[in-house]
């Protein structure tokens, strides 16, 4: 049996993070907490979600268990939940997930985990540049770039970290120096990425959330968000766009 209680804010954050890429997911209730990971149908991006046991108000599991969840359905339900609500998730059998908050109880049919696409292996990436910044600033930069182009260049060197977008007639550069960043190692890297994916990723975060970017040259980027006051970690890995000569 699974019986856990979490804040509405935590549930909304997790569901938003996962539905950015997939509509169904395997959710693992482990001794150390909740874990999920999935790759989008185009094999361009991966999401990895971890919520430590201590981030829950209550975390009771008889044994480690994996369930298959219709994340779109849970996301729809989460729209009715306030960030301050306490939400209880109960799994008593293989077929049903109960979602309880206030005087409301939803019963959601579970999916056979084996019917959900196999979970991806997390790639081992040696990426030279590490940038730590406020997620809200990153979100503003991506929103601005979206008005110019459908792709952006992330660039890191000793001068700082830049996000660049160029359209037919307009261009934009977002630049933060080492002193403006929370942490920066000055590593040299440059890659191009899809704005559409980045916009979806940004929806989980806001001002005050922490974002760590691990960047290489023509390599996937790792975007690690520390959310809900550090109680949840959401990581996205996004493949680069190959630039034409």
Curated annotation (Swiss-Prot):
SUPFAM superfamilies: DNA clamp. InterPro entries: DNA_clamp_sf, Pr_cel_nuc_antig, Pr_cel_nuc_antig_C, Pr_cel_nuc_antig_CS, Pr_cel_nuc_antig_N. Keywords: DNA replication, DNA-binding. GO terms for molecular function: DNA binding; DNA polymerase processivity factor activity. GO terms for biological process: leading strand elongation; regulation of DNA replication. Pfam families: PCNA_C, PCNA_N. It comes from the Archaea. The keyword Repeat does not apply. PROSITE patterns: PCNA_1. Sliding clamp subunit that acts as a moving platform for DNA processing. Responsible for tethering the catalytic subunit of DNA polymerase and other proteins to DNA during high-speed replication. Belongs to the PCNA family. Homotrimer. The subunits circularize to form a toroid; DNA passes through its center. Replication factor C (RFC) is required to load the toroid on the DNA. This is DNA polymerase sliding clamp. The gene is pcn.
